[in-house]
């Protein structure tokens, strides 16, 4: 087990990670609101959770991880009523799409995916405890949290509530840090057909912020070692989670370490449907982009740095995967009978060094950029050793093992011996590429080119037309 340093948003500095039980690190991550397809900004946050999970396991920790499904909120209420469907009918296909997207980008399945609507009793219990402590008031049959009565409000976002006017409040789930007000815990129904529950705290439905506090309590009984989410959730959502949970259960530790992933930009700008730069995973795949390249790009920048998504960056990600895969394929051609039962025991000193440096990079607040530098340096050295025939079978198998070790985080490599394409398959792909170029579908054209290059096929434009040859 390797010591980890995480940047804790609560303290604003890197800290030694000290879970309650290293064999069962508890992690809660804010998941999707299932009213539409997740966009690639959401996907970056979900893949950050995947890298966190894979890294904890690789560094020797046991994990027990949760990502919630928000299946009741303002947007879902609005759209379900408009579509004349029940909440369950409306959210079911979007929930299914979320899991399909996770599978497409090779995200590992977590232990728990609770739905908000399955935790109503826990929400009611939290409200009742807050009421007993005088932290709740009622207005127009809805219940609100009085933040001025909670001494530690603002400790995560460092917000100053001293200038707040008493009794100002928000019914909406999302608002800006500059306009802090009391937030709603339980909403009375306002619209015809609005989903409601009949409970001891009244008829209505939960506010968004209450849902995560309740699901954490339902899954884990108390608090967690790590809570993650996008930086946009730090305020008000996570600040309000702290207020609710610590207000109701002041004797318990709610969250030890807060980790927040930064925004994703598209061509240097914030994603916006009006700007035409708003993409879902399915949009990108329909354009011919490789899901592995999308995954690689989204995990390749440190989670606390903004990531710029562009076609150039996708092409770069494809090239980087190809660089690693080509190295692996060279070894597999020499060792075609190797089985995929990797044991990760290394005897070669420089391979041991690669492993150690890779682990140390991840243990330093998931420094993926530094970890990737180790990967590419190892690929460079392996290729050099193969070029000069300086490796025997035992050593080559160890090279495969270290690439597999790296792929425990990357999740983009294929360890099956390369199957050569038939000539007819190559001709068919080249014809498809020509059609794509004619239609100015350059993303698909480039994807086919990359696929052929990965198979060792070079395309040449000649006066007589397109020719291809094997490297």
Curated annotation (Swiss-Prot):
Record key words, sorted: Aminoacyl-tRNA synthetase, ATP-binding, Cytoplasm, Ligase, Metal-binding, Nucleotide-binding, Protein biosynthesis, Zinc
Protein's UniProt keywords contain Ligase: yes
InterPro entries: Cys-tRNA-ligase, Cys-tRNA-synt_Ia_DALR, Cys-tRNA/MSH_ligase, CysS_C, Rossmann-like_a/b/a_fold, tRNA-synt_1_cat_dom, tRNAsynth_Ia_anticodon-bd
Span of the annotated motif 'HIGH' region: 32-42
Catalytic activity: tRNA(Cys) + L-cysteine + ATP = L-cysteinyl-tRNA(Cys) + AMP + diphosphate
Cofactor field: Zn(2+)
A GO biological-process term: cysteinyl-tRNA aminoacylation
Details of cofactor binding: Binds 1 zinc ion per subunit.
Compartments reported by the entry: Cytoplasm
Binding site for Zn(2+): 30, 212, 237, 241
Domain of life assignment: Bacteria
Motif 'KMSKS' region: where in chain: 270-274
Ligand binding (ATP): 273
A single GO cellular-component term on record: cytosol
Enzyme Commission number(s) from the entry: 6.1.1.16
GO molecular function, one term: ATP binding
Self-association and partners: Monomer.
Protein family (similarity comment): Belongs to the class-I aminoacyl-tRNA synthetase family.
The protein's name: Cysteine--tRNA ligase
């Amino acid at each position: 087990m390797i010591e980890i340093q995480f940047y804790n948003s609560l303290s604003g500095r890197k800290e030694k990670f000290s879970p309650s039980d290293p064999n069962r690190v508890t992690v809660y991550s804010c998941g999707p609101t299932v009213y539409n397809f997740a966009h690639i900004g959401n996907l970056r946050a979900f893949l950050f959770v995947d890298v966190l999970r894979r890294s904890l396991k690789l560094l020797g920790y046991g994990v027990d991880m949760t990502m919630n499904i928000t299946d009741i909120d303002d947007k879902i209420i609005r759209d379900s009523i408009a579509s004349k469907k029940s909440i369950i009918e409306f959210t079911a296909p979007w929930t299914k799409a979320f899991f399909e997207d996770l599978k497409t980008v090779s995200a590992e399945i977590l232990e728990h995916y609770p739905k908000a609507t399955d935790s109503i009793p826990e929400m009611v219990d939290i409200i009742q405890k807050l009421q007993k402590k005088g932290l709740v008031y009622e207005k127009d049959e809805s219940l609100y949290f009085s933040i001025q009565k909670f001494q530690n409000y603002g400790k995560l976002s460092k917000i100053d509530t001293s200038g707040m006017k008493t009794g100002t409040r928000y019914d909406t789930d999302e608002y800006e840090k500059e306009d802090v007000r009391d937030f709603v815990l339980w909403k009375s129904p306002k619209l015809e057909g609005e989903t409601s529950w009949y409970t001891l705290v009244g008829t209505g439905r939960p506010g968004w912020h209450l849902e995560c506090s309740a699901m954490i309590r339902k899954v884990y009984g108390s608090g967690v070692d790590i809570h993650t989410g996008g930086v946009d959730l730090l305020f008000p959502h996570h600040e309000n989670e702290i207020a609710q949970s610590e207000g109701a259960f002041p004797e318990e530790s709610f969250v030890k370490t807060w980790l927040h992933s930064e925004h994703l930009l598209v061509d240097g700008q914030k994603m916006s449907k009006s700007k035409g730069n708003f993409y879902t995973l399915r949009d990108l795949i329909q354009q011919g982009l490789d899901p592995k390249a999308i995954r690689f790009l989204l995990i390749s920048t440190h989670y606390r740095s903004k990531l710029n998504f562009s076609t150039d960056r996708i092409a770069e990600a494809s090239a980087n995967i190809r660089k690693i895969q080509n190295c692996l394929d060279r070894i597999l051609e020499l060792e075609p009978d190797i089985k995929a039962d990797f044991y990760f025991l290394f005897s070669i000193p420089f391979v041991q060094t690669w492993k150690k440096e890779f682990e140390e990079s991840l243990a330093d607040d998931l420094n993926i950029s530094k970890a990737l530098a180790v990967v590419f340096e190892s690929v460079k050295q392996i290729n050099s050793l193969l070029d000069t025939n300086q490796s025997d079978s035992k050593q080559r198998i160890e090279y495969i093992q270290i690439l597999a070790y790296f792929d425990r985080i990357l999740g983009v490599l294929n360890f099956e011996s390369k199957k050569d394409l038939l000539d007819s398959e190559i001709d068919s792909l080249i014809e498809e590429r020509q059609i794509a170029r004619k239609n100015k579908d350059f993303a698909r054209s480039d994807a086919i080119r990359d696929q052929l290059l990965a198979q060792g096929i070079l395309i040449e434009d000649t006066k007589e037309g397109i020719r291809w040859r094997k490297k």
